[in-house]
């Protein structure tokens, strides 16, 4: 967008992580793209995603033709954003960045409907969570954060997630050996 993002932000305020995630988006835009603007924020409850996201996005795009980015903060919202883009003739011109690494959304990247997705390995998160709980149970110091990395998927690397995309594919697997060795199960 060359620093000229005009954004429709789709949120679900009922979901607890939404508030810090939106604050992070706003802070990042303020620090790194002061000329970018959130034109409209659409709050849709999880149980209404299937009926409310598509018409709300269509309306936002028609009311604000300058919009060039739609951010569904949870990537499963994308399945309702893509039809709105198709119907408004903006599919492929309006960028759709999102978060979670859900396989069908990664396939949307391959199809050109979503521009990028910040993914996380659920398996890696599980290993890190178990490690933290084991440390707590043994009276050991536990890390303050899981320290599980994110992976940014776009058209240049989405094939690493598989065709079709699979959960936990594309993130590497060195963590499995690392945790098993740490726990004394291997080696």
Predicted regions span which residues?
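Short beta-strand elements at the ligand-binding edges of bilobed clamshell
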Residues: 9-12, 111-123
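Short beta-strand elements in bilobed, periplasmic/extracellular small-molecule ligand-binding domains
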Residues: 6-11, 26-48
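Hinge/cleft segment of the Venus flytrap/periplasmic-binding protein
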Residues: 32, 124, 128-187
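Loop/turn elements at helix/coil->beta-strand transitions in domains of secreted/extracellular proteins
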Residues: 2-6, 32-39, 64-69, 90-95, ...
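Extracytoplasmic/secreted cell-surface and envelope-processing proteins
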Residues: 17-20, 79-81, 107, 161
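Extracytoplasmic "Venus flytrap"
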Residues: 10-20, 69-75
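Hydrophobic alpha-helical segments within soluble ligand-binding/sensing domains
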Residues: 1-5, 20-24, 52-54, 101-105, ...
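Hydrophobic alpha-helical
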Residues: 25, 45-108
């Amino acid at each position: 967008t060359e620093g000229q993002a005009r954004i429709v932000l789709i949120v679900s305020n009922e979901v607890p992580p939404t508030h810090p995630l939106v604050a992070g988006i706003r802070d990042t835009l303020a620090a790194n793209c002061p000329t970018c603007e959130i034109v409209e924020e659409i709050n849709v409850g999880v149980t209404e995603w299937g009926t409310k996201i598509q018409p709300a996005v269509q309306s936002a795009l028609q009311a604000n033709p300058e919009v060039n980015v739609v951010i569904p903060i949870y990537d499963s919202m994308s399945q309702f954003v893509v039809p709105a883009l198709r119907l408004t003739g903006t599919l492929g011109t309006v960028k759709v960045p999102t978060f979670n690494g859900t396989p069908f959304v990664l396939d949307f990247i391959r199809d050109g409907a979503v521009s990028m997705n910040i993914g996380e390995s659920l398996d890696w998160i599980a290993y890190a969570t178990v490690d933290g709980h084991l440390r707590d149970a043994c009276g050991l110091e536990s890390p303050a954060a899981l320290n599980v990395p994110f992976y940014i998927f776009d058209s240049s690397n989405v094939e690493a997630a598989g065709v079709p995309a699979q959960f936990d594919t594309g993130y590497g697997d060195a963590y499995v050996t690392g945790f098993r060795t740490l726990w004394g199960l291997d080696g």
